Amino acid sequence: MKKALLIIAIILGSMTAFAQNLDKTEARLIKAFLAEPAKEGTNAQALKVADINAIANIEGVTVQNGHITAIEWKDKHLGGTLNLAGFKALTKVDVSRNELTAMSVEGCTALVEVNASRNRLTEINLAGCTALQNVQVYKNRLTEIDLANTPMLEKLNVSNNLFVELSVANCFNLKTLNCQGCHLESLNVSGAQALRNLYCGYNKLTSLQLSGVEALQNLNIDDNEITTFIVSGLPSLASLICSDNNMVTLGVRNCNALLDVVCSYNDLTTFTLDDCPNVQYVDCSYNDLTQLVLSNQTFLQRLICNNNQLTMLDVSFDQALTYINCRFNQITDFRTIACDNLRMVACQWNP
């Protein structure tokens, strides 16, 4: 019995020593954060910290070998500035759904994932985070973010912030970018050669250059101010959504993997699909088109082109086509040669 008690005492003593041996700089910065005001009281009170010197015992904090490796403080009503600069063993931070106003993880060379979404951040410092792969900072008040030293970044969600311009140029490993619902007037994705998913709707973009993003699969530029948009030579592009842009001209060519095109609620007078042989769904409703030629689209199944000014519609030899909605047009020339699977044509309110 005495031997067992001795072993327990040794273990407890080791744990106490371990907690006390936390890196001094890390301990100082965490204590400073705990002293900052939260929604009610201090951050220490919000986290129900009984002893600010026992950092290793704080819920959501993981410590290994004298260094903090993870912080998970989601939805804890925390406030103020969180400074984690120089935490060399830190790999993951989740402080989403709080009221933080500023955050720094500068020099956290092991950091892989940051989630600081749904806060009140006006600034964030990611400098020197060379291992960073996933950044989620959506629904904040950021006006800028520097990604120059994040070469491993794969996922970035900065939607619903206050950016006027954003550059992910030369983020060679970036696969998914969500920057919807900001105030973007300029977006630079040049050189983001691994980019597959780009969601940049609900901004103020007047143009978008897609050079060097041949891996792109999904593109959403809904609700911007792009009047002319030419998409060419994107062999992996499967989905294009560009509604609500006041767009006058849309040209899509040499996109062999393209399946869906949604360009409704624009001012299109010109819409062309060239060398896009696998398109299955087109919605170009609520535009100003007078002619629409989509013949020889072998895999096209559904066409929505209502509320235009069409006088001619040609879907000849579209062998997979089953449904057309061409209501509210002026169609007098309707070509459906060899459309053997066409089952429904909604064509009311034409001459």
List each model region and its residues:
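N-terminal capping/linker segments that flank leucine-rich repeat
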Residues: 3-92, 109, 130, 151, ...
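Leucine-rich repeat
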Residues: 65, 87-90, 108-111, 129-132, ...
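Conserved hydrophobic beta-strand positions in leucine-rich repeat
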Residues: 69-71, 93-95, 114-116, 133-137, ...
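Canonical leucine-rich repeat
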Residues: 81-82, 103, 124, 145, ...
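Thr-biased low-complexity repeat/linker tracts and other Thr-enriched repetitive architectures
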Residues: 110, 122-123
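Leucine-rich solenoid repeat scaffolds
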Residues: 327-351
